[in-house]
A protein has these predicted regions:
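The feature captures the beta-strand-to-loop junction immediately N-terminal to the Walker
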Residues: 261-266
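Helix-to-loop junction immediately C-terminal to a conserved catalytic motif
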Residues: 279
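Conserved ABC nucleotide-binding domain
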Residues: 297-298, 356, 362-383
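Catalytic Walker B motif of ABC-type/P-loop ATPase nucleotide-binding domains
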Residues: 400-404
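Transmembrane alpha-helices and adjacent helix-loop boundaries
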Residues: 1-218
Length: 425
């Protein structure tokens, strides 16, 4: 709905402003003064060219810094859906809003530069056609790749200029036929290269492994832990109905600190649904869930994660484009505080070192430290499940819920998992 609402809002503003007398209607505003920098008026194209590139590179650098940070990993987690991100304590609504505002700021700066460069401004460059063209640039270059935006914009404009010359000669008539060509190209790209053109560049020139600079990083804040034997979780007559189907039928059990408890049942018995009810992914039909003596039945996944409960999932949820180390560091989100502006200005490095030190420690704990620089999407299912456990441990939970953790693991990996669970106990 958001893309459609954004397009509709843009169309409404476009037509509204095009009918306002004081804005010049469709003719727009003429005689926009040049930008003045330190008393120097940028009247020529050369000065504006330098200024535009300065803004573009500064924006790219800020975006790269942001993506390589605590809030950046939270933003990248949105691509995999909200369930995993919320379970790590991330406010998905907040970061969607952050992305929207940052995109609006960049668009506003671009419009300001455009108006002063052209010395005139009218509604046509801000209409639906241009919006679709900008979207195509992002898709072609690679959504989520900062340099992909530059590549996509360059390719689209170069090809567009050539098509505007060649197509009228081939067809024998003039028109915006390049739109049809771009539509076909977009379908081909989405089918055969959904990650965009930059993904080919990234595969050919992979990034070097992250420099290990966190050996002397201070530890992250630790959560207060219950004493062995303390009552941690109480599930009391919990029931979940989907229409007329009863998925969980009045289940009750208690878990105490230091216990390893297994929830056993055949496929479709409601085990994962029970996990979802306990962790706030789904709401209860009736019953009560108490965590450390406090009712959590009506809380969100994020609030329950803040209370000290962490989990893995039946089907592995991760960010394939990030390294194993970065995926695990996502689990330390609630144990750090750096924000968007700090990340852009690179003022969060001390905290980042602490996050990566904790992530490496948890990977060593499960025997995956040697794979920490590999892309998570390149791992087999077994290591991906172990990585999920390391991510959950990185939250420093009081209660750890593992949904089918041994599924897909080989014998030696299962033995290693059993050792980790005994150590956590």
């Amino acid at each position: 709905y958001l893309p459609l609402a954004t397009i509709a809002w843009g169309l409404a503003l476009n037509y509204t402003m095009a009918n306002m007398d004081f804005l010049g209607k469709y003719d727009g505003l003429m005689g926009v003064p040049p930008i003045t920098v330190f008393g120097l008026a940028l009247n020529d194209g050369k000065g504006m060219y330098v200024l535009i590139w300065a803004f573009a590179l500064a924006a790219a650098l800020a975006a790269l810094h942001l993506l390589d940070s605590r809030p950046g990993r939270a933003i990248r987690a949105l691509k995999s859906g909200t369930t995993m991100a919320e379970a790590m304590g991330i406010s998905t609504f907040r970061y969607k809003l952050v992305v929207f505002v940052l995109a609006a700021i960049l668009a506003a700066i671009s419009g300001w530069l455009y108006a002063h460069f052209q010395r005139t401004v009218n509604p046509s460059p801000f209409g639906i056609n241009k919006g679709i063209e900008y979207l195509f640039m992002a898709v072609l270059g690679g959504v989520g790749h900062v340099w992909g935006a530059f590549l996509g914009a360059g390719v689209v404009k170069l090809v567009e200029d050539q098509l505007q010359v060649l197509l009228p000669r081939l067809i024998g008539t003039s028109g915006n036929f390049e739109v049809i060509v771009f539509g076909i190209v977009m379908i081909v790209v989405l089918k055969y290269a959904p990650e965009g053109l930059w993904s080919f560049v990234a595969r050919r020139f992979p990034q070097p492994a992250r420099r290990k600079d966190w050996a002397d990083a201070p530890p992250l804040p630790a959560r207060s832990k219950p004493q062995r034997g303390d009552l941690l979780l109480q599930v009391q007559a919990v029931r979940k109905e989907f229409g007329g189907l009863v998925a969980v039928n009045d289940i009750s059990f208690d878990i105490r600190a230091g216990d390893i408890v297994g929830l056993i049942g055949p496929n479709g018995a409601g085990k994962s649904t029970t996990f979802n009810l306990v962790t706030g992914v789904q709401g209860l039909t009736r019953g009560q869930v108490l965590f450390r003596g406090q009712p959590v039945g009506g809380l969100s996944s994020r609030q329950i994660a803040q209370a000290g409960m962490s989990r893995t999932f039946q089907h592995v949820k991760m960010i394939p484009e990030m390294t194993v180390l970065e995926n695990v560091a996502l689990g330390g989100y609630l144990r750090s505080r750096s924000g968007t502006l700090q990340a852009m200005l690179r003022l969060d490095r001390a905290e980042e070192r602490g996050l990566f030190a904790e992530a490496e420690a948890q990977l060593q704990r499960i025997g995956m430290a040697h794979q920490m620089h590999e892309l998570a999407g390149n791992l087999a299912l077994g290591p991906q499940r172990l990585m999920e456990i390391a991510r959950a441990l990185c939250t420093d939970p009081a209660l750890l819920l593992l949904d089918e953790p041994a599924a897909g693991l080989r014998h030696q990996e299962k033995l290693a998992l059993a050792g980790v669970l005994r150590q956590v106990k």
